[in-house]
Amino acid sequence: MKKLTEKEIREELNKMKGWSLKGNVIEKTFLFHDFKEAVNFLNKVQPIADSMNHHPDVCIYYNKVIVQLTTHDAGGITDLDVELAKKIDELLT
């Protein structure tokens, strides 16, 4: 696991649609038709996060899911956060 510099983070985010840097986290908001779809999405994220032993912070607001990624042990964003973000995006392609 490698902690990324701000430049490295921005370079990665430029390749990823919808993700942004917010302080010490990368964040993306996902919109769904309703609450059930939002929960189903998180049910798909869970096994991926578990397999990586890396878990996002999430908030659900009816049909909106906000996902935040950071590596607390590293004190910032690492390659693991970027990898998980890409895998989460793949769920919707």
From Swiss-Prot:
Keyword Plastid: no
Transmembrane regions: none
Top-rank taxon, per record: Archaea
EC number assigned by the record: 4.2.1.96
Single biological process term from Gene Ontology: tetrahydrobiopterin biosynthetic process
Molecular function per GO: 4-alpha-hydroxytetrahydrobiopterin dehydratase activity
Keyword list, A-Z: Lyase
Catalysed reaction, written as an equation: (4aS,6R)-4a-hydroxy-L-erythro-5,6,7,8-tetrahydrobiopterin = (6R)-L-erythro-6,7-dihydrobiopterin + H2O
Listed InterPro entries: PCD_sf, Pterin_deHydtase
HAMAP family: Pterin_4_alpha (MF_00434)
Entries under PANTHER family matching the protein: PTERIN-4-ALPHA-CARBINOLAMINE DEHYDRATASE
Family: Belongs to the pterin-4-alpha-carbinolamine dehydratase family.
Family matches, as NCBIfam families: PRK00823.1-2
Name by which UniProt lists this protein: Putative pterin-4-alpha-carbinolamine dehydratase
